[in-house]
Design a protein with these regions (language model features):
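Short coil/turn motifs at beta-sheet boundaries
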Residues: 23-25, 127
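P-loop NTPase motor core
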Residues: 61-88, 93-94
Length: 179
């Protein structure tokens, strides 16, 4: 008897990927940990605007959602806002930028993406899935967001979000603020 592990009926689903082969494949989860003023937000915006695009301005993500208390006051987010509205064509009526951590909105985003993934997998002949990015930036001072034990949508995103093609990137000042 052959004892090698075999893959049984694995469907091959695709989503857009970065043109840079050294970057993590999407959907990806990641944490950027560094003290204040060490360019975490700058790195996040550059990843969104350059690294996870096709080189001609087409994003690897169909939707980008930013949760950051500084999203409306930090000029680093301005180019991302313009990119989402202009390049990606997301209307102003669709909320993508949150200056407060809105658990209900995040749960709704995850729920909608779950439904979208199921619908796209059921569509005959379709191999490409809708890919979204959720960024949680600058909430190190709020234990209800990053340091919440037990049932938490962030725990769910990091453990099972990939099954719905959800990439999640978190930035924090200290590793101890995450749990």
């Amino acid at each position: 008897m052959n004892a090698k592990i075999q893959v049984h009926d694995k469907s091959a689903w695709e989503c857009r990927q970065s043109r840079h082969g050294h970057l993590p494949k999407l959907p990806a989860r990641g944490c950027l940990i560094a003290p204040s003023q060490q360019f975490k937000t700058t790195a996040l915006t550059d990843m969104i605007l350059r690294h996870y695009t096709d080189g001609r301005g087409k994003s690897c993500f169909e939707r980008i959602f930013i949760f950051s208390p500084s999203v409306d006051i930090d000029s680093s987010w301005g180019p991302v806002k313009e990119f989402v509205r202009v390049n990606m064509g997301v209307p102003d009526s669709e909320k993508c930028f949150f200056h407060e951590f809105d658990h209900d909105a995040l749960n709704k985003i995850v729920e909608n993406q779950h439904k979208m993934t199921i619908a796209m997998k059921e569509k005959k002949g379709n191999r490409r899935l809708f890919n979204i990015l959720i960024v949680i930036d600058d909430f190190s001072d709020d234990p209800a967001v990053l340091h919440n034990q037990g049932k938490n949508v962030l725990n769910t995103l990091f453990t099972r979000g990939r099954h719905q093609n959800i990439s999640c990137w978190i930035s924090a000042q200290k590793l101890t603020t995450l749990s």
